[in-house]
Amino acid sequence: MIIKQLPLTDLHRHLDGNIRIETILDLGQKFGLDLPAYDIEALRPHVQIVEAEPSLVAFLSKLDWGVAVLGDLDACRRVAYENVQDAMNAQIDYAELRFSPYYMAMKHNLPIAGVVEAVVDGVEAGCRDFGIKANLIGIMSRTFGQDACQQELDGLLTQKNKLVAIDLAGDELGQPGDLFVNHFKQVKDADLRVTVHAGEAAGAASMWQAINELGAVRIGHGVKAIEDPKLMEYLAKNNIGIESCLTSNIQTSTVASFESHPIKTFLEYGVKACLNTDDPAVEGIELPHEYEVAAPKVGLTPEQLKQIQINGLDLAFLSDSEKQALRDIAAKR
C-alpha cells in the first residue's frame, strides 16, 4: 500500500514509453500514417503488452508506434505535457521522466535538439498546470550505436541546465557499456548525474562496468545483481540505488515470476531499491498498481513497502531542500 503521508516518486519512467493510445490514434490520423488499426481497442495489442514478451528487444518494439506518430515538434511537446498529467493522475508527487530524443526524432527526421527543447517546454508547462514536480533525464539509446548516441548527447547537452541526469538504455547485450565510456566523460564534464540500464538483459558484470567506468550512481532494473554477493554488498555500502520495475521485468521475461523477483533480497541486503513504472502506457499499468498488486505478489511486507517509498525520495536527483519540501507537503495530507 501507498502511505499518503510520504512523498510518492517514480524515478524510472520513460516519457516515450508512455504515449496514450488516444494520442497515438489522434496524431497518426493527423499525419496521415498507416496505423495497424483505427480504433482504440483494435490498436491496443499493437502498442500495449497483452502477454509477456520473449525478450527485452521484443518488448521495446511495442514502443515503436508511439514514437512513429511524432510528426512534428508540437507532437513531442504534447506527449511531454500529457506525461506530466498522467503522473498527477497516478498521485505521483515527483517524477523523473526520461526520454530518448534520437528515438523520438527518428521516424520523421526531426532535429534532435528541437525534440529536446520541445520536451523541456512540454514538461515545464505540465508542471505549471498540474502542480506536481518533475525533472528530466536524457537517454542515449545504445541500440542505435555509438555515433547515434553522440548525436543524441550533443542534442541533450543543448538543454543541460534543464536535465538532472543522463541514462544509457536499449540493447544491453548487443551494445555493451564499454562502447560508451567517452560519452560519459562528456556527461561528467557537463556536471550531470548518471543512471544506467544494466543487469537487465546482461549480467552483473554490466552493472560493475556501469558503476566503475560510466559513473552510475543509480542502476535501472539491476536484477542480475542477485548473482554477485560482492556487488550486492557494494551497492548497499555505497548507496547506489536500484530502480526496480516489477511488472516490466515480468513482461520483458527478465524475471520468470513475481515470486522470484530479487527486490526483496535487495532490501534484506540493505540495498536501496525503489518502485517505478518503466513504460506505463505500454505495460497497461500505473504506479499504484506496482504498490498494490505487483508488490504483494513479490511478497513485500508493509514495512518493506514503506522503506521503498522512503528510498524513492532518498534516491531522487533533488537537493536536500527540495526533498524536505516534498516531505512537508506529504506530511500535511
UniProtKB/Swiss-Prot annotation:
Annotated active site: E200 (proton donor)
Swiss-Prot/TrEMBL site (Important for catalytic activity) positions: H221
Chain positions recorded as Zn(2+) binding sites: H12, H14, H197, D278
Binding residues annotated for substrate, in chain numbering: H14, D16, G170, D279
Name recorded for this polypeptide: Adenosine deaminase
GO annotation, biological process: adenosine catabolic process; hypoxanthine salvage; inosine biosynthetic process; nucleotide metabolic process; purine ribonucleoside monophosphate biosynthetic process
Record keywords, A-Z: Hydrolase, Metal-binding, Nucleotide metabolism, Zinc
Top-level taxon in the UniProt lineage: Bacteria
Record carries keyword Zinc-finger: no
Cofactor(s), by name: Zn(2+)
Catalytic activity field: adenosine + H2O + H(+) = inosine + NH4(+); 2'-deoxyadenosine + H2O + H(+) = 2'-deoxyinosine + NH4(+)
Coiled coil spans: none
Cofactor binding notes: Binds 1 zinc ion per subunit.
Role this protein plays: Catalyzes the hydrolytic deamination of adenosine and 2-deoxyadenosine.
Keyword Membrane: no
NCBIfam families in the cross-refs: aden_deam, PRK09358.1-1
GO cellular component, one term: cytosol
Pfam assignment, any one: A_deaminase
One GO molecular-function entry: zinc ion binding
Organism, scientific name: Aliivibrio fischeri (strain MJ11)
Listed EC numbers: 3.5.4.4
Annotated family: Belongs to the metallo-dependent hydrolases superfamily. Adenosine and AMP deaminases family. Adenosine deaminase subfamily.
